[in-house]
Amino acid sequence: MRLAGWGLRWAIALLIAVGEAAVEDNCGRNEFQCQDGKCISYKWVCDGTAECQDGSDESQETCKSVTCKMGDFSCGGRVNRCISGSWRCDGQVDCENGSDEEGCSPKTCSQDEFRCNDGKCIAPKFVCDLDLDCLDGSDEASCPMPTCGPANFQCNSSMCIPQLWACDGDPDCDDGSDEWPKHCGTPHPSGPLQDNNPCSALEFHCGSGECIHSSWHCDHDPDCKDKSDEENCAVATCRPDEFQCSDGTCIHGSRQCDREPDCKDLSDELGCVNVTLCEGPNKFKCQSGECISLDKVCNSVRDCRDWSDEPLKDCGTNECLDNKGGCSHICNDLKIGYECLCPEGFQLVGKHRCEDIDECQNPDTCSQLCVNLEGSYKCECEEGFRLEPLTKACKAVGTIAYLFFTNRHEVRKMTLDRSEYTSLIPNLKNVVALDTEVASNRIYWSDLSQRKIYSAQIDGAPGFSSYDTVIGEDLQAPDGLAVDWIHSNIYWTDSILGTVSVADTKGVKRKTLFQEEGSKPRAIVVDPVHGFMYWTDWGAPAEIKKGGLNGVDVYSLVTEDIQWPNGITLDLSGGRLYWVDSKLHSISSIDVNGGNRKTVLEDKKKLAHPFSLAIFEDKVFWTDVINEAIFSANRLTGSDISLMAENLLSPEDIVLFHNLTQPRGVNWCERTALRNGGCQYLCLPAPQINPRSPKFTCACPDGMLLAKDMRSCLTESESAVTTRGPSTVSSTAVGPKRTASPELTTAESVTMSQQGQGDIASQADTERPGSVGALYIVLPIALLILLAFGTFLLWKNWRLKSINSINFDNPVYQKTTEDEVHICRSQDGYTYPSRQMVSLEDDVA
């Protein structure tokens, strides 16, 4: 009997142990088990927010046992969080207790740098250059009066510029003295603005040289850099029965304080006092309209005209005692009636039921990834980023991020914490557009005065001999520039020609993709991962356009509430576009399909005339040509506006240089068996609209068309000769006349001589007169050959009938050369038949 009792006890103990083990094994390998049995991700343990209802994931005992992996830094303290080792002593506090910035040695500048009194390092050429580059101004303290060398011109402001820039029709001194008549005499005939007024009849010519819409002249909002569009304007006066808005416009007096803004600056609704409102926890609105204090309700004194403050049945009754009044979560008893409330993270649906709020529906809830939980949410980061414990923002891990920006005569480089600030490419004329290729460590820029696009290795950029001219002709105003880092192409806009063009990064092959009369394309950004490009256009009407990187499927993405769109950038991981509007003084964002539009920031002072912007982590950076400065702000909320650099000279484009901004992708033009995708000229990525979309299409230079095989190129004269019967051809816009001959590569393994369009056309013209005479010679010979071939086939057929054989069908060998190049059967390269010529002959020769 005693043995049976012991056996029963052992069995019960074993069952309990197995049950406990089963509970412990409920969670996966990468999960943490709360004390109540709930499983959460190990990434959420000791991150400052309790996911376990019992708080065991944030307890001191749990966090003490956390060990940081190699390369990480332990914050220590009660929470003991782990951060990236690269965040240690980076000038930004990441641990709650600030331990990551304790005991850090002062930053040391290199031998070829100047150290400001505040510890910032700048290039020595910035010292005593009349610009405050140190935030404390120490780089301009105790400077002697500057004297210019023999090869320089000294401006009236003592600034020195190269002598070649003086009297060239383009002001380079900050006071414009290099173009004053007393120095130059008559205007220089070869200046960039040979026409005294390059603006159209519908535009206003600013004194500083820009062209703006005529409707912006005298609208009480300066748009010119020198504010000349608001000079000598008549002052508007309003009638006695009108209200004058802060911008000077007049509206009828009855529209003031009507709860609907009628002034553009909303000044008609400022300072209004609404006496009819009855809101707040201590107010009660009678059914007869009066507003009384809540302490007068159910006090046996009738204060409302209709006695609605003293209902006999409701006063003194607590409806929450009966099944919580039907509320699913919280019932709050009121003096009259009751109300259902919801805990944080839930919302009331109807009058009684609470439902979880999906915070992740808002794209700005988290900086990158959002995980919705019951009653809460969790933010996570993309690969290459880690969640910062203090701010809950995603911070990049790895290389140092730099801002590259144009400063009229140079390109400068600056770290995000402003600890390093140097000149990257000096001695330029008028650099406007800028972009980089991180993998090759190369930078590209356009010069508005030289009307060229250049490139250089970033490490060797200061040496002028290392510059490469990528595009050196047929440019008028290359205002925007973008690099396709996957397919090694560059895209640029030309606001005077109204074009968007593409070329390989060597500049050997180029093509005009888009041209429209009246358009003024400005900034451009590319998404080579998905095959799209986006650009701003401040023509009439102003809009933001989207199209494929091969020039197809172009349409307007933003057409409303947009006036002067300038810079544009893409948050590739978040799938959102950001742009600045110089007329609306705003930064806005929208998803890549045109939805979920949001205004990030509106500020007439900090966004007086924004020109370009860049995005990284949770920050947006922008240049402003009127403030002559660079600012930053939180890209989700528009808060935390900071001054990054000031006292600049016409800062225009800005890009962020970091390896995470240009993720790797597949270059399908190089994945096929044929070189360059089998294309004779350009192989361009196609937009990935759906899973069946082509990976690329072939393109020909301006003035040439695709042949029937959709790979070879024909001149327009040849296509007219070889076309049989009527055909429908969708023409692409032809850009400016090229003087250089386009380089045509071979399709498949056929060697073709490289020749210009004129050579191809002239060859076709010289061969055409002798073709009729050749028919009299070739035709009889061809008939004899056909007769002999037919006789051979008859003999072979008779011979095969007398031979026994077994045949095996092999579908691989049944595939003909025609099948290989047929556009509908190719697994990689396709085209859009409705947009291409399909009636041309294959035989070009």
UniProtKB/Swiss-Prot annotation:
Q: How does it sit in the membrane?
A: Single-pass type I membrane protein
Q: Which family does it belong to?
A: Belongs to the LDLR family.
Q: Which PROSITE patterns match?
A: ASX_HYDROXYL (PS00010), EGF_2 (PS01186), EGF_3 (PS50026), EGF_CA (PS01187), LDLRA_1 (PS01209), LDLRA_2 (PS50068), LDLRB (PS51120)
Query: Which protein are we looking at?
Result: Low-density lipoprotein receptor
- Any one of the GO CC terms: basolateral plasma membrane
What are the protein's UniProt keywords?
Cell membrane, Cholesterol metabolism, Coated pit, Disulfide bond, EGF-like domain, Endocytosis, Endosome, Glycoprotein, Golgi apparatus, LDL, Lipid metabolism, Lipid transport, Lysosome, Membrane, Receptor, Repeat, Signal, Steroid metabolism, Sterol metabolism, Transmembrane, Transmembrane helix, Transport, Ubl conjugation
Residues annotated as glycosylated:
N659
Q: What is the role of the protein in this entry?
A: Binds low density lipoprotein /LDL, the major cholesterol-carrying lipoprotein of plasma, and transports it into cells by endocytosis. In order to be internalized, the receptor-ligand complexes must first cluster into clathrin-coated pits. Forms a ternary complex with PGRMC1 and TMEM97 receptors which increases LDLR-mediated LDL internalization.
Where is it predominantly found?
membrane
Q: Which InterPro entries does the record associate with it?
A: 6-blade_b-propeller_TolB-like, EGF-like_Ca-bd_dom, EGF-like_dom, EGF-type_Asp/Asn_hydroxyl_site, EGF_Ca-bd_CS, Growth_fac_rcpt_cys_sf, LDL_receptor-like_sf, LDLR-related
Q: Positions of the region Clustered O-linked oligosaccharides?
A: 712-753
Where are the Extracellular topological domains?
22-774
Q: Where are the LDL-receptor class B repeats?
A: 441-487, 488-530, 531-574, 575-619, 620-660
What does the record's free text say on domains?
The NPXY motif mediates the interaction with the clathrin adapter DAB2 and with LDLRAP1 which are involved in receptor internalization. A few residues outside the motif also play a role in the interaction.
Q: Which residues form the signal peptide?
A: 1-21
Map motif NPXY motif onto the chain.
Answer: 808-813
Q: Where is the composition biased (Polar residues)?
A: 717-733, 742-757
- Annotated segments matching region Required for MYLIP-triggered down-regulation of LDLR: 796-845
TM region(s), chain numbering: 775-795
A biological-process GO annotation? long-term memory
